[in-house]
Amino acid sequence: MSEFIAENRGADAITRPNWSAVFSVAFCVACLIIVEFLPVSLLTPMAQDLGISEGVAGQSVTVTAFVAMFASLFITQTIQATDRCYVVILFAVLLTLSCLLVSFANSFSLLLIGRACLGLALGGFWAMSASLTMRLVPPRTVPKALSVIFGAVSIALVIAAPLGSFLGELIGWRNVFNAAAVMGVLCIFWIIKSLPSLPGEPSHQKQNTFRLLQRPGVMAGMIAIFMSFAGQFAFFTYIRPVYMNLAGFGVDGLTLVLLSFGIASFIGTSLSSFILKRSVKLALAGAPLILAVSALVLTLWGSDKIVATGVAIIWGLTFALVPVGWSTWITRSLADQAEKAGSIQVAVIQLANTCGAAIGGYALDNIGLTSPLMLSGTLMLLTALLVTAKVKMKKS
């Protein structure tokens, strides 16, 4: 690796895009997303094997999001001048280690340790993903490079849950994570081969990132982001027990539902730019309102498989607008501090994922099967009301 560590120290002066490096980063992103969501489709066998409830098993998603939240806030201060190439390799190693620890976990504690390793990689990577991509291509090619990265995210979201469900039935949930560890090893070798030296900056200006929250409408926006993602994770983390017990889906049927959800999400992401051109605020208020209605429909009529499948498709199609919409809100309303605002956004989303999965799991175990749906629908409705009343939007 020394030959490429020594070269191109002036990354900012890059004149030709390094597409191999961009695709290696995109592959790493896809692997992180896939492994993050594997427990969603493997929750029941994981819980049975470890002798815990499905609600407790769902906390494997919670701990990943919780650790990722802190990693996203503090990673840039921690790594400072460290070459970003080494940092990305470390994230790929943590991804691989996480999969192996989960695969060999004989207790809930070891499972959580493995998922915490994933949280470090996930939060740290997302905090620096945009700046990393921008250093691999010339300025004119940045949008195309970012589209490759986020395209990998969309593809990973499409295949993660149905692939986990299908392979889990075929080879067992532990071997699914062993297969994911192999993907992690491929990440390591591809990054070593393709990623150039990307020297870190010794220090950043000591500006208070959280002072951004004092700007008009920003705090309301972050609260809305929190509620929308908490609502998503309160429902999606427990989609397997809800759909298998409420609608009576078997493993094969659930796999098809999850695949439909993923395809709908991919289509929603593809259409999001067209919708957001019309009105970002309308999309940010309208999407959670549709999701709130969908949660109500599933609660009342979810025992019908056709209704349950339709709700999954509508949910995937609609929620796809949410992350793209809030990123657009940041680039328009906080363009002068987009990097700092993005860091706060990542932390808020991870905190929301933590709280949504945790409270949803508690509700599932202690209140009832449809309680995660009711929690999700309530949060989505509150999000729609808050966006309508308080969130400010600058025109592009």
Curated annotation (Swiss-Prot):
Query: One of this protein's Pfam families, by short name?
Result: MFS_1
Entry's Gene Ontology cellular component terms: plasma membrane
Q: Where are the transmembrane segments?
A: 22-42, 55-75, 86-106, 108-128, 148-168, 176-196, 216-236, 256-276, 282-302, 306-326, 344-364, 367-387
Q: Which loops or segments lie on the Cytoplasmic side of the membrane, by the record?
A: 1-21, 76-85, 129-147, 197-215, 277-281, 327-343, 388-396
Where does it live in the cell?
A: Cell inner membrane
SUPFAM superfamilies attached to this UniProt entry: MFS general substrate transporter
Cite the ranges annotated as topological domain Periplasmic.
Answer: 43-54, 107, 169-175, 237-255, 303-305, 365-366
Q: What GO annotations for molecular function exist for this entry?
A: antiporter activity; purine nucleoside transmembrane transporter activity
Membrane topology field: Multi-pass membrane protein
Chief localisation class: membrane
InterPro entries per UniProt: MFS (IPR011701), MFS_dom (IPR020846), MFS_Efflux_Transporters (IPR050189), MFS_NepI (IPR023680), MFS_trans_sf (IPR036259)
Reactions the enzyme catalyzes = inosine(in) + H(+)(out) = inosine(out) + H(+)(in); guanosine(in) + H(+)(out) = guanosine(out) + H(+)(in)
Listed A to Z, the keywords are:
Antiport, Cell inner membrane, Cell membrane, Membrane, Transmembrane, Transmembrane helix, Transport
Its family?
A: Belongs to the major facilitator superfamily. DHA1 family. NepI (TC 2.A.1.2.26) subfamily.
Describe its function: Involved in the efflux of purine ribonucleosides, such as inosine and guanosine.
- Name of the molecule in the record: Purine ribonucleoside efflux pump NepI
